[in-house]
Every structure is written in structure tokens, then in C-alpha cells.
Amino acid sequence: IADKAFYGKGNIKRIQILNSNFVHIGNNAFSQMGELERLDIHVADPQQLSLGDNIFGSSGYFNIYVPQGSVGAYQIAEGWSQYAEYFRELEF
């Protein structure tokens, strides 16, 4: 996802990253998204994703859904651990 890809898109409530081969979230990609409620990431290993700076900015609180069994890995992964309380398991 490019830098500032969804920056300021206040009307978007849910984003799904369905490709398990996804590798990067750019700087401020999801910043200033006041209505965002849910981000689904279908990537089991957080180490597979490189993160830009300030990816969520001041978007407020929302849930980040990751594959079953991956919540713990995301909660302690570098770059993701600051959002530990946001993570939930995806249900299929």
C-alpha cells in the first residue's frame, strides 16, 4: 500500500487486505481516517509486512483482524506491538 494511500478518507469504515503475499504498508497509509472501524489483514506472519512511519496516524481506535492463531505474533511484532489492543482473530 503506497504512502498516504487512504490518508484522510474519512468515509471508509472497513479495509480488507486479502492477498496473503502482501508485503508493505507505506507512511501514513491509514492516517486521518476518523470513521475506520475495521482493518482485515489476511497475512499470518507480521514479519512478512514492512511498515512505514505513522501508518495509522490519528485515525482513532479500530479493530485489526488477522488470521486465527496470529494475534499473539502481531501483538509482540516490531512496528505492530504499539497496536496490541486493536488485534482480533478473523473468523472464516
For each of these PLM feature ranges, what is it?
Residues K9-H24, G34-S50, G60-S70, E85-F92:
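Structural signature of tandem-repeat unit edges
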Residues A2-Y7, G26-A29, D53-I55:
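Consensus positions within tandem repeat domains that build extended binding/scaffold surfaces
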Residues G52-I55, G72-A84:
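Short, aromatic/basic amphipathic alpha-helical patches
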